[in-house]
Structures are given as C-alpha cells and as structure tokens.
Amino acid sequence: MSWQAYVDDHLMCEIEGNHLSAAAIIGHDGVVWAQSATFPQVKPEEITGIMNDFNEPGSLAPTGLYLGGTKYMVIQGEPGAVIRGKKGPGGVTIKKTTMALIIGIYDEPMAPGQCNMIVERLGDYLLEQGF
C-alpha cells in the first residue's frame, strides 16, 4: 500500500459522518511522505519543534505548537508518543512512530476523541509494522 493510500483510506476516512480536515505522514526529517490536498505547507522549524517536544515532553507548551503557520495550544498528550493541540473548535493530533509523524487536523463537528482515535490507530499499526 502506498503512503498516499494510508492518508486517503485511513486518515481521511469517514467516522460517524465526520472526517479530518487535513492529514499527513511526514518523516522525522520533515520530508512529506504523503498528505491530503488540504494539508498546510509545514516549515522545517515546525517539524523540529515537534520532534524536540517528543524528545523533551513539554517543550512546546510555553510557545504553542505551530503547523503550517497556525498556532495550537498544546494540551494533554502522551509524553514521547502523542502531542495534541487545540485551536478554537478544532485541533491537531500528532502520533510519533519509529520513522514518521502521523498528523491529523480536525474541526467541528468532529470531536477531538475521533481525531485521536484515527491518528493513533494508524500510528500504532505502523509501529507494529516497523515504521
């Protein structure tokens, strides 16, 4: 299966009538493996900040999480494994695997828990597969 198929079929899938606004799979080095048409252009320093927070949990909390120039308030995640961010009625979930970052961006009416489930389920599967 191509990385694009993982984005299209597993991240942008419909769940209870809702779906993510945007999604991507990005390597730890910031290289985009696959993304939805709506995923924002990320800056290298944004990926560096995210990777730093996985290595030193809490480092993004004071400044916020930036993705495509949009600032998200960092909320409770799983240190070293999942970063969650909130902006108004929407937000972002980022799951770290061995080689990649699985990123899902959502907005109302999708609930944060639905985004978490979609992103973390694919992330867990890819971890099991060695990615």
From Swiss-Prot:
Family: Belongs to the profilin family.
Biological role: Binds to actin and affects the structure of the cytoskeleton. At high concentrations, profilin prevents the polymerization of actin, whereas it enhances it at low concentrations. By binding to PIP2, it inhibits the formation of IP3 and DG.
Subcellular location, record wording: Cytoplasm, Cytoskeleton
Protein name: Profilin-2
One GO CC annotation: cell cortex
PROSITE patterns recorded: PROFILIN
Subunit: Occurs in many kinds of cells as a complex with monomeric actin in a 1:1 ratio.
Range of residues in the leader sequence: none
Native source organism of the sequence: Ambrosia artemisiifolia
Main subcellular location of this protein, as a coarse class: cytoplasm
Pfam entry (one): Profilin
GO MF terms, alphabetically ordered: actin monomer binding
Swiss-Prot/TrEMBL keywords: Actin-binding, Allergen, Cytoplasm, Cytoskeleton
